[in-house]
Structures are given as structure tokens and as C-alpha cells.
Amino acid sequence: LIKDFTMTQFAMVFPGQGSQTVGMLAELAAENPLVEKTFAEASAALGYDLWALVQQGTVEELNKTWQTQPALLAASVAIFRVWQEKGGKMPAMLAGHSLGEYSALVCAGVIAFDEAIKLVELRGKLMQEAVPEGTGAMQAIIGLDDASIAKACEESAQGQVVSPVNFNSPGQVVIAGNKEAVERAGAACKAAGAKRALPLPVSVPSHCALMKPAADKLAVALEKLTFNAPTFPVVNNVDVQCETSAEAIRSALVRQLYNPVRWTECVEFMAQEGVTSLLEVGPGKVLTGLTKRIVDTLTAAPVNDPASLSAAL
């Protein structure tokens, strides 16, 4: 998969929801006009000022999933463009966590940025519509093995939906589904020996079976988009594969919405392919923090402000 390997032993990874903060990228934007220019392109596609929302909006506004998703996509693409402008080395591979997979596909030239912005806004709206507010939930299960978590979910469902949805690292798995079933499963995980079962402050139970109706509608929108061949291999969440055909990439994005994010396996796959370090292209450092827990020989660093950018270049 990796062409000129001596040059590129690093991969870029792109974060998903939960990494957004009001005021993100302000420092980088102060020194690089390309950041606000990127957000202006996104704003034109959306019909509202996304940069103003990100810089001056409320946490509540930014955390609405149909606004979070375009904001994070624009942030990651802006950082990637600044990296390119500064002559940064090109990565061997890309991967993104959930929404971050869209950022990776834009940076790999698969989907046009303005179309991707509208697409992830729609993805957020469809996700929110699929589950009435207050009826879905997610919990992070800390310190329990995957098999025990899956068993706790199966035994707690009682005709409702609850399943593991993010395999973030060994000992850190997120479950999602109907609120009551998630509460039962969280309690069952604790009874089985989990250190913690932490309710997450989200309104949408992502990547579980409740998202299937949203995925069916997303598929219709994806059919209308032009997909180009990727310039870098992009490891997808749902199959831990690098697809090149439009049809296969579309299918993976549709299935991603109601299937687990296999992040642990994505990082292991990149390491097996010879990647030795990860750069996290986006706000925050969630993925950087997970890296060593997955493959302890990998190094990782975030790139999102002038200091981290110059350190990585």
C-alpha cells in the first residue's frame, strides 16, 4: 500500500465528535489566513457563518451534531491545507474516527470540500432525526474486555437496542442504544468488573442499529456525489480496509453509521503496514491519547496550533 516508504512513515488521523471546543484554531488562524479562508468556503456551502459559530457561539450551539460535524470537518481540512502550504511531508496513509473519516476522504481528494460540508451537515440532521431527543444514550466503558462488554449488551437489550459502537482502545469501549438498555448494560458492565461506566453528554446514539434509517437516507445523498480515487490510502472504520472504488467507499460510509468504529484495529492495521508515527490533524488530542494504549511502539502528536505545527513540520 505504501509507495515510497523511506520518506513517509507517518499517518494522519482525524478526530470525530467530542473534540470540538469554542475558540478552536484561533491561534492558528491568527498566523495563517488559509484557516479563515477554508471556513469561509464552508460557510458559503452552509449558508451561515461557521467561523463565527466556532469562535463566538455557545457550547450548546456548537454541540448540535449537525453543526459539530461541519465545524470539525472544516477545522481538520484547514489544518491539512496549512500543513500543505508550509511544505509538510505527505502521509503514507490516513484514517479518521467516525466523522473524521469524512475529513480523511476530503484530504485524500475523494470528495470535494464544499460537498462534504453539506453532506456531514445532512448526516448530523439525519442522525438527530432518527432518535427522538432524550431516548438514546451512550456510555464509555472503562477497564473491561470487549467480549464481556458485548455479552453485557446482549443480556441487557430486553428487546431494545444496545451494542458496542466505538472500540477506541483496549479497555475503552463506548456502548450506545436506547437509554434504558444502555443504563442496564452499563450497570451489567460494572457488575462484570468494569472500572467505570461513564454516561456521555450526547444526544444521538451513534453507530448502533437505531441509525439504520438515517443510513438509508444518507445512502441516497451519497449516490448523488462524485467520488474520486484517493491520493492516499484511507483506512475505513467499518471494515478496516483501504478502498479505492467509489462504490466501495460509499458502501463503507453508509454502513459506518450503524456499525461500530473499529479504531483499535485501524491503528493496529497502520502499524502493521509500517507506519511508525501518527499526526492528529484536528482540534484536541483524543486520538493521540489512545495511540500508545493500542500500539505502544507508535508515537503520536496533535497538530492544531502554531507551536504543534512547527514541532511537527
Feature-to-residue mapping (PLM):
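FabD-like malonyl-/acyl-CoA
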Residues: F5-I149, L200, S277-A311
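Alpha/beta catalytic cores of group-transfer enzymes, especially the acyltransferase/condensing modules
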Residues: Q17-S19, A44-Y48, A108-N259
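Non-catalytic positions within long, well-ordered alpha-helices that form the structural scaffold/packing
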Residues: Q84, K190, A271-G274
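Short amphipathic alpha-helix with an adjacent loop that forms part of the alpha/beta core around
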Residues: S156, A311-L313
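A short, acidic, amphipathic alpha-helical segment used as a generic capping/interface helix at domain edges
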Residues: N259-V275
